[in-house]
């Protein structure tokens, strides 16, 4: 989860500087929302728990093309700064059968107008690129379960320093399990085996895609995350969206959020001198790399647009795009991304991820920083427990790309979370990426089988696969039994 309200902002202007959100935003929040206290939000998934918990957090404009082989409708790098009078365009991308529709929704003074354009896609091309088979399904499942498992096991060390991780978990660090979770004030807010807000919000995106028949709609996601912030998932026993990050909290509780989430996010970012770039967007977007992975433009624009609903810093968009493009490329398994043995050519994948993600950055210096995190090969370079900076979006993205270079899921995720810092978020992104690379069978069974809400998650996956078959004639169901064995 991104840095929570009241816990010291973890968004950073660079590796060496941090900037907190300035000013009191309470006058711009809806009066009925929970107000952040000095120590954080009183939120809990466990009945009777009173521990104060919130989290550290922190996406940009772009040209919105019609996915599945691109149709441009928006501007490239560096959109205009939002003002109270600005008209913002929120692109929604829908796929009907093998046709693509990009609808842009303009918002001004509470009014909406929509225009849609359609682009036909050659059926043979798209189905060939989708490459639907049992291997693909196992990688999709690896992405989803990898995210949730990495999140849940990462909770064990979240907000601890590396030294504290060793003190608490040294005896069992080679075989960490959910039941090893220490019972301190923070961790008692979640039951054993539960994931946190990172995966909650990923599932919000997943449900939005399913219930809108493949359309990726920032407005719909905005409504869902606002509702989740107030109630969580009641069907799972939640009474609030546990662990909301600072940037997310202030954005979704602005009065203008549902009318224009992009503008709301930009105003919150502006109050922080446009320097806060925390990880609350990249943590949730892995599922966008799965949906219609055959077209990278589709993935890129959806990742950027959903990130931007709460996080206005371009680095937040760039990091979300990099992660989602990597997942999509691995699902495609195109020859240019494989070596002679059929294994992934990680260098080629990184270079292509950089090409897409760097579109959201304006200067060579910012692009160089992006690449330095993508190429990271040693965890110590990321300084994941660095005081006051644990929630920087590039630290989380860097964790994912470090994991991409590993070959053992359990060992890699354990090593990563034992670095401390924002471990659940780093674990979620790394778990999604490595799970996609190594498939779901690479994830330790003691982690997948002991996820608290495993069966609930499986029903959502089942709904997605059936939606893709019924609406888009893309059939994953022969390779999916409805549950993990």
Enumerate the language-model features and the residues they cover.
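Structured, active/binding-site neighborhoods that engage oxygen-rich ligands
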Residues: 2-47, 51, 55-76, 84-485
């Amino acid at each position: 989860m991104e840095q929570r309200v009241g816990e010291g902002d973890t968004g950073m202007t660079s590796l060496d500087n941090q900037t907190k959100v300035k000013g009191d935003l309470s006058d711009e929040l809806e009066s009925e929302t929970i107000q952040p206290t000095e120590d954080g939000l009183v939120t809990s998934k466990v009945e009777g728990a009173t521990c104060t918990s919130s989290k550290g957090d922190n996406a940009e404009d772009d040209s919105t093309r019609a996915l599945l082989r691109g149709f441009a409708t928006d501007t490239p790098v560096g959109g205009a700064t939002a003002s109270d009078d600005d008209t913002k365009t929120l692109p929604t991308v829908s796929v009907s059968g093998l046709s693509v529709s990009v609808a842009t929704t303009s918002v001004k003074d509470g009014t909406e107008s929509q225009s849609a354009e359609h682009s036909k896609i050659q059926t043979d091309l798209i189905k060939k690129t989708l490459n639907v088979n049992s291997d693909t399904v196992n990688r999709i499942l690896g992405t989803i379960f990898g995210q949730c498992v990495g999140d849940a096991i990462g909770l064990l060390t979240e907000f601890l320093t590396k030294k504290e991780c060793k003190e608490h978990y040294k005896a069992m660090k080679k075989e960490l399990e959910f039941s090893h979770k220490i019972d301190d004030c923070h961790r008692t807010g979640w039951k054993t085996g539960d994931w946190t807000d990172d995966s909650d919000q990923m599932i919000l995106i997943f449900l939005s895609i399913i219930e809108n028949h493949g359309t990726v709609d920032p407005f719909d996601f905005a409504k869902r995350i606002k509702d989740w912030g107030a109630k969580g998932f009641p069907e799972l026993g939640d009474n609030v969206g546990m662990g909301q990050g600072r940037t997310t909290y202030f954005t979704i509780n602005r009065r203008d959020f549902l009318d224009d989430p992009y503008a709301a996010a930009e105003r919150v970012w502006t109050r922080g001198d446009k320097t806060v770039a925390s990880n609350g967007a990249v943590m949730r977007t892995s599922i966008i790399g799965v949906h219609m992975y055959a077209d990278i433009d589709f993935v890129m624009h959806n990742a950027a647009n959903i990130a931007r609903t709460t996080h206005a810093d371009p680095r937040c968009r760039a990091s979300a795009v990099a992660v989602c493009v990597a997942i999509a490329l691995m699902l495609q398994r195109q020859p240019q991304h494989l070596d002679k043995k059929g294994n992934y050519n990680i260098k080629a994948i990184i270079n292509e991820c950089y090409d897409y993600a760097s579109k959201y950055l304006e200067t060579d210096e910012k692009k160089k920083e992006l690449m330095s995190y993508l190429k990271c090969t040693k965890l110590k370079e990321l300084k994941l427990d660095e005081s006051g900076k644990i929630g920087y979006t590039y630290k989380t993205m860097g964790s994912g790309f470090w994991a991409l270079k590993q070959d053992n899921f359990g060992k890699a995720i354990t090593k990563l979370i034992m670095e401390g810092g924002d471990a659940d978020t780093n674990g979620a992104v790394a778990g999604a990426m490595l799970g996609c690379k190594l498939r779901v069978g690479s994830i330790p069974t003691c982690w997948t089988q002991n996820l608290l809400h495993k069966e609930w998650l499986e029903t959502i996956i089942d709904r997605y696969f059936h939606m893709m078959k019924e609406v888009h004639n893309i059939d994953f169901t022969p390779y999916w039994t409805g549950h993990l064995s």
